[in-house]
Amino acid sequence: MEYYPEYNDYYQELLTKVDYLILGQHALKLEDSYYDIYKVVTIDLVYKYAEEVIEALNTGYFKILAHPELFIFRYPDVWNDEMDNISRRIIEAAIKNNVYLEINVNGARRGIVKSKEGFDTWQYPHLDFWKLVSEYKDAKIIINADCHKIDYLYDSVTEEVYEFAKKLNLKVSERIEF
């Protein structure tokens, strides 16, 4: 679910009925509208995405951050100091707030794209983002199949993502701890 501060009462009410909430910030709140993060984004919108995600994590409402690297979705082959900085801020906020970072299998199901260097990659999970996560030993990580069809529950792509995590020496949690 998205986070918007004007719905704080609603999030608090939900938490009386469920064990935890998952943050999946798919849209940014602009002055008079919402902006779909799956569209082309500018660096200013990427910073806004990071600020909204960090604000949400700081509320304590969320236990999992879904596809934390979604901000780079349209630019899988762009990685620079700004992307590194933004990613570190998100990762560190997740650690500070005891929030799991989700490696999202559905991103891998979108298929392989070519990087500028000519190698095969996914739009997400994003290799450079998860390399950064591997530097943070306190980061909590889960893999989520993000099933939109029953056939996706534990498919070959899910196995590929587990292998991806293994190659990066990411310690993937089997259970959510409260």
Q: What are these model-derived regions, one by one?
A:
Residues 1-97, 102:
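Extended substrate/RNA-proximal surfaces in nucleic-acid metabolism proteins
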Residues 72-73, 78-178:
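Charged catalytic cores and adjacent phosphate/nucleic-acid-binding surfaces used
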